[in-house]
Amino acid sequence: MKKTSFLIVGKHAVLEALKNPSRKIERVFLTEDAQKKINRENQSLNLFKKVSVFFKSKKELDNLCGRDETAHQGLIAEVEQLEEVTLKEFVNNNKNNNLNIIALDEVTDPRNIGSIIRSAVAFEIDGLIVKERSFPAKSKLLYKSASGGVEHLKIFRVSNISTTLRFLKTKDFWVSAFDVEGSKDFTENKWSGKNILLFGSEGFGIKRKLLENSDFRFKVKMSHKIQSLNIEFC
């Protein structure tokens, strides 16, 4: 395997990568049963035409994936990273006056990040800001949880979230922090204009400095019996 390539697993993650012309795919490993099922479900698409395909048994795929990793569903692909656009380039070149971008403060669990990516695509969020040092960019768990969403969402890796938010505020973005002590119900906001939706880590929430520099603090209404939700459900 190339030094720059990595493995992604799972039906939706691999199929969406195959459909993405911007994604370079080195090889695909799959069982014969998985290929038959995929061809039946995608009869109008010849998804394997331009890639090297290697048929493997389920046990061989288990070994390739790693026993402690996520279920592969009979399908694994060796891929390269997508070419990235920097956040600065995206903001400066985008003429849309209505943008919603999620920013994550020290959220590190790959399953949670993958679920956030999947939800962001479903709700037509325009991008995701993550801290480069703690972002598991090549995680099989992240790709599996995202169910192909990585292929459809701009992910901006930055060195410092606080500095990034200050820059975005100079570009007319409003920063809205989601916090248990928020004073406003997020469902009552129209979310027009340019917005940054800031979420904190699973264990510690949003850093105080980021909260102090936010324009708004929103809460998610819940039963009084439960104090907090996992980040992936927010």
Please report, for each region that a protein language model flagged, where it lies by residue.
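Short acidic-hydrophobic, aromatic-tinged amphipathic segments that line or gate anion-handling sites
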Residues: 8, 52-57, 154-162, 218
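Active-site/ligand-binding-proximal alpha/beta "capping" segment
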Residues: 176-230
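Short amphipathic alpha-helix with an adjacent loop that forms part of the alpha/beta core around
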Residues: 88-95, 167-169, 187-191
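Short, acidic/turn-prone active-site loops that include or flank metal/cofactor-
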Residues: 33, 58-60, 133-135, 202-204, ...
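RNA substrate-binding interface of SAM-dependent RNA methyltransferases
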Residues: 23, 94-182
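Short, glycine/polar-rich helix-capping loops at beta-to-alpha or helix-loop-helix junctions
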Residues: 37, 135-141, 204-210
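N-terminal positively charged helical leader segments and presequences
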Residues: 1-92
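Structured adenosyl-cofactor binding patch, chiefly the S-adenosyl-L-methionine
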Residues: 20, 26, 122, 143-149, ...
